Design a protein with these regions (language model features):
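Non-catalytic, mostly N-terminal accessory regions of nucleic-acid modification and defense proteins
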Residues: 1-158
Length: 158
């Protein structure tokens, strides 16, 4: 098991790797406008990974019911969920449609998460990265080992 210091170094390496991909498209003082929301989204993605299949199955059963939000939260065992078939890893399977698929993924989060994401004003950055051809490679960084932001990584912040 990696030490706390090694985990911190790994996450710092992730941020620098993403910053390298943003060079030429964004100014250094703008990197955080991309890295912070993506890191939050990836963290949500990792947290939901254990119950993803259960949520998708439950969604098929309850998508037309008025109480679906409550039932999907129960299925995810969290106060939020995502009903997209995509995860960060699954998004990598279709690089030609990355912008469309990533937007669909984001739109399938529960309303409380979508509200958080809207406050980042991130939508324009998706367009910019897609138009500049870096959206796929930036998202791909989050699927590497250093991009794993699952539960055990929360200890680096303690």
């Amino acid at each position: 098991m990696a030490t706390r210091s090694a985990k911190i170094d790994q996450k710092a390496d992730l941020i620098w790797a993403i910053a390298d991909k943003l060079t030429g498209v964004y100014k250094p003082h703008e990197y955080g406008d991309v890295i912070l929301p993506l890191t939050v989204i990836r963290r949500f993605d990792c947290i939901l990974s254990d119950t993803k299949d259960a949520v998708l199955q439950k969604y098929d059963e309850v998508k037309n019911l008025p109480m679906k939000d409550i039932l999907l939260r129960k299925a995810s065992k969290k106060d939020f969920y995502n009903t997209s078939k995509y995860t960060f890893e699954r998004l990598m399977d279709d690089p030609d449609h990355i912008e469309e698929n990533f937007r669909e993924y984001l739109n399938k989060f529960s309303a409380n998460v979508r509200d958080i994401l809207e406050k980042f004003k991130f939508d324009g950055h998706i367009t910019t990265m897609a138009n500049k051809g870096i959206l796929y490679i930036v998202l791909k960084e989050y699927t590497t080992d250093r991009g794993n932001l699952h539960y055990e990584t929360q200890r680096i912040f303690l």
